[in-house]
Curated annotation (Swiss-Prot):
Numbered residues of crosslink Glycyl lysine isopeptide (Lys-Gly) (interchain with G-Cter in SUMO2): 70, 74
One of the GO BP terms on file: neural tube closure
Family in the record: Belongs to the eukaryotic ribosomal protein eS7 family.
Reported disease: Diamond-Blackfan anemia 8: A form of Diamond-Blackfan anemia, a congenital non-regenerative hypoplastic anemia that usually presents early in infancy. Diamond-Blackfan anemia is characterized by a moderate to severe macrocytic anemia, erythroblastopenia, and an increased risk of malignancy. 30 to 40% of Diamond-Blackfan anemia patients present with short stature and congenital anomalies, the most frequent being craniofacial (Pierre-Robin syndrome and cleft palate), thumb and urogenital anomalies.
Source organism (scientific name): Homo sapiens (Human)
Entry protein name: Small ribosomal subunit protein eS7
Length: 194
């Protein structure tokens, strides 16, 4: 039988902690005895975290390698349903493990000869996290409200068609995003008038 850490590949060869091993084990069990076997066999995760998202509820964030994100998203709806059953209704979200490279300053410019790609900038990574978070629904608009004290509130407009599927999770999404990026975000399902 495979070990519980078979589905988790940590960067720099670190050892997965107990919680990550539990998630890995759950994925293995799903792979063994569900019809997701073929899709899950090729996939692994890089990390997992459990966080509080207000109201005493907990959410599980599972980080996956960027190249495998598309494959995860093909089966994400079913995978999330199964994992939520296993972990007694905690919300589960999948997010790609992305790196943010620091902004080149005068001092640090000489060290890295390569230009920093757009996909490694803070803005791009934070936007991408938001998109991963709300999958399978799509972001159809964004408004950033800057208050007088300088604080920002991001209003994210989600696809009305997916409202029934994700509406019960929007608080979780806000909590997870705040935890990962420190930014406040509100989710809305606007009616579109042309």
């Amino acid at each position: 039988m495979f070990s519980s850490s078979a589905k988790i590949v940590k960067p720099n060869g670190e050892k997965p902690d107990e919680f990550e091993s539990g998630i890995s084990q759950a994925l293995l069990e799903l792979e063994m005895n569900s019809d997701l076997k073929a899709q899950l066999r090729e996939l692994n995760i890089t990390a997992a975290k459990e966080i509080e998202v207000g109201g005493g509820r907990k959410a599980i964030i599972i980080f996956v390698p960027v190249p495998q994100l598309k494959s995860f998203q093909k089966i994400q709806v079913r995978l999330v349903r199964e994992l939520e059953k296993k972990f007694s209704g905690k919300h589960v979200v999948f997010i790609a493990q992305r790196r943010i490279l620091p902004k080149p300053t005068r001092k640090s410019r000489t060290k890295n000869k390569q230009k920093r790609p757009r996909s490694r900038t803070l803005t791009a990574v934070h936007d991408a996290i938001l998109e991963d978070l709300v999958f399978p629904s799509e972001i159809v608009g964004k408004r950033i409200r800057v208050k007088l004290d300088g604080s920002r509130l991001i209003k994210v407009h989600l696809d009305k068609a997916q409202q029934n599927n994700v509406e019960h999770k929007v608080e979780t999404f806000s909590g997870v995003y705040k935890k990962l990026t420190g930014k406040d975000v509100n989710f809305e399902f606007p009616e579109f008038q042309l």
